[in-house]
């Protein structure tokens, strides 16, 4: 059986590429090679899975920023590394957050409140 974190990571990628509305639990189960029942047993419902994917996405961004900061030899190099990644981060963020804001406003509110703290 696949590890839950792998399912979250792969589903996050799918949501960024195709949007949260376009991806159904059937699509995720099929893509991951698991039954829909297993998916529901692991996550309960799509809303819970989206929340976990969003947390994973933010954590991935935080980890990338930390790696870039550690890799840089000085502040200017750190800034250049961050600029290099900025477009891809923002593109993925916008695609993911737009769908969540429109179709899952409760999750959006929780996520934006958590990030403000």
Segments the model singles out, each with a brief description of its role:
Residues 49-57, 64:
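Alpha-helical DNA-contacting segments of helix-turn-helix folds
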Residues 30, 44-45, 55:
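Residue-level detection of the helix-turn-helix DNA-binding "recognition helix"
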Residues 1-18, 22-31, 48:
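Basic, helix-initiating cap at the start of DNA-binding domains
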Residues 33-43:
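Short hydrophobic/aromatic patch on the recognition helix
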Residues 87-117:
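Short secondary-structure transition hinges
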Residues 52, 66-92:
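Hydrophobic alpha-helical connector segments
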């Amino acid at each position: 059986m696949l590890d839950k974190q792998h399912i979250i990571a792969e589903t996050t990628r799918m949501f960024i590429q195709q949007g949260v509305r376009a991806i159904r639990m059937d699509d995720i189960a099929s893509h991951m090679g698991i039954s829909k029942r297993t998916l529901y047993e692991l996550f309960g419902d799509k809303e819970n899975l989206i929340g976990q994917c969003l947390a994973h996405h933010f954590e991935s961004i935080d980890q990338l920023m930390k790696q870039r900061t550690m890799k840089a030899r000085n502040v200017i190099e750190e800034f250049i590394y961050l600029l290099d990644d900025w477009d891809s981060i923002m593109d993925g963020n916008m695609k993911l957050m737009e769908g969540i804001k429109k179709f899952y406003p409760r999750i959006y509110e929780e996520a934006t409140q958590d990030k403000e703290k």
